[in-house]
Amino acid sequence: MATRLCCQLDPSRDVLCLRPVGAESRGRPLSGPLGTLSSPSPSAVPADHGAHLSLRGLPVCAFSSAGPCALRFTSARCMETTVNAHQILPKVLHKRTLGLPAMSTTDLEAYFKDCVFKDWEELGEEIRLKVFVLGGCRHKLVCAPAPCNFFTSA
């Protein structure tokens, strides 16, 4: 099972952040199935940090104490992406980009929790959960997600 992450929307930067649950922002080590991972400072993420997490499709910034870069998610079970998510998420993101009223922070966090983290945390399907970068992430080429076979059980 992957380290538990908290989904938070940062309205000041207008990005969705995943923060390790219980970890302090100053880089407290995280205990996970792969041993102890230290959270780097928000200012710099070493190029090799988290490279072993590439099998999960997570970019190396995923375990930063500042949270990863803006992300979009694809769940093999829900087939939810920013393109086909019932037209809800694309419209919300577009409105937020334009500075228009959109889905509340609470509703957006609940959306990601319901669509993504339920499968990941409760059903243990982290292998079939793919995380793709929306844009502007300098780490996206370090851990490119592997192709997903939707018919292979986790």
UniProtKB/Swiss-Prot annotation:
Family: Belongs to the orthohepadnavirus protein X family.
Keywords: Activation of host NF-kappa-B by virus, Activator, Apoptosis, Host cytoplasm, Host G2/M cell cycle arrest by virus, Host mitochondrion, Host nucleus, Host-virus interaction, Modulation of host cell cycle by virus, Transcription, Transcription regulation
Presence of the UniProt keyword Transmembrane in the record: no
Region Mitochondrial targeting sequence, residue ranges: 68-117
PTM annotation, UniProt: A fraction may be phosphorylated in insect cells and HepG2 cells, a human hepatoblastoma cell line. Phosphorylated in vitro by host protein kinase C or mitogen-activated protein kinase. N-acetylated in insect cells.
Subunit structure: May form homodimer. May interact with host CEBPA, CFLAR, CREB1, DDB1, E4F1, HBXIP, HSPD1/HSP60, NFKBIA, POLR2E and SMAD4. Interacts with host SMC5-SMC6 complex and induces its degradation. Interacts with host TRPC4AP; leading to prevent ubiquitination of TRPC4AP. Interacts with host PLSCR1; this interaction promotes ubiquitination and degradation of HBx and impairs HBx-mediated cell proliferation.
Superkingdom of origin: Viruses
Signal peptide range: none
Gene that encodes the chain: X
This protein's GO CC annotations: host cell mitochondrion; host cell nucleus
Name of the protein: Protein X
